[in-house]
Amino acid sequence: MMELAGKTGIITGGSSGLGFAAANVLAEAGAVVYAVSRSGRPKLEGETSHENVIHLAADVSDYKEMGELTERIGHEHGIDFLVNNAGITVKSLAQDVSDADFEKVLQVNVSSVFKLCTLCYPYLRQSPHRGRIVNITSMAAHLGFSEVVPYCTSKGAVLSMTRGLAVEWAQDGINVNSVAPGWFPSEMSRKVMDEERKQKILARMPVHCFGNPRDIGAMVKFLVSDESEYITGQDFAVDGGALSFGY
């Protein structure tokens, strides 16, 4: 089914991992997807994108560059959806995190998300469909994790931002939701876990395996489709039951 035929949108962090998979899932459903990343191309050698995925090189923390990019896409094609997926982390005990590292995580994971939402706002408001924003949060917005406190802080902020924008922009015909990934094979997850921690995580989860990145794409596709018309201000965990596990 081509549920997203006729829709155009932007996804950040689209060169690899969850963003790359989501961009392709959306494109396969008929959308034209502008996948923004620092490299402007698929990260893994030999990896190809759907023909509807257009890779663009840009730095989400460069507001001038992102302003020019959104203006060009918005004027030429319109913007029906935005997926804020780009994110970074640093692995360090909280007391050892430098001011520069803390500020960089918040700059990329929070400030740039808010800025891109506001840059896309006039085009989302004009969309013939209800405009859609999907922010990628994390289990870390709901749980505490050692050695990644700046990341946890940033994702909690994005969750609150999602709810605030959903309330404020509902009158403008824009739905704002978020998706909280659990454990997926990605460059970021490899940075924060060794093999011992990986096995402990898998043993604890109700579904004892990491997710397929396309699982995130499927949830994002639903949230930018017409099937989610009455859903806004919500956070959807795609995590193999990780957030549901009790002691």
For each predicted feature, which ranges?
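Conserved glycine-rich cofactor-binding loop
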Residues: 8, 15-16
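Short, small/polar-rich loop/turn modules that mediate ligand/substrate recognition or access, typified
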Residues: 83, 170, 175, 231-233
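Alpha-helical segment proximal to the catalytic Tyr-Lys
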Residues: 122, 167-171, 229
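Residue(s) in the substrate-gating loop at a strand-loop-helix junction
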Residues: 138
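Short C-terminal tail/terminal secondary-structure segment
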Residues: 143, 221, 232-247
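Active-site helix of classical SDR
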Residues: 117, 154, 162
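Substrate-binding pocket helix/loop in short-chain dehydrogenase/reductase
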Residues: 93-94, 98-106, 189, 201
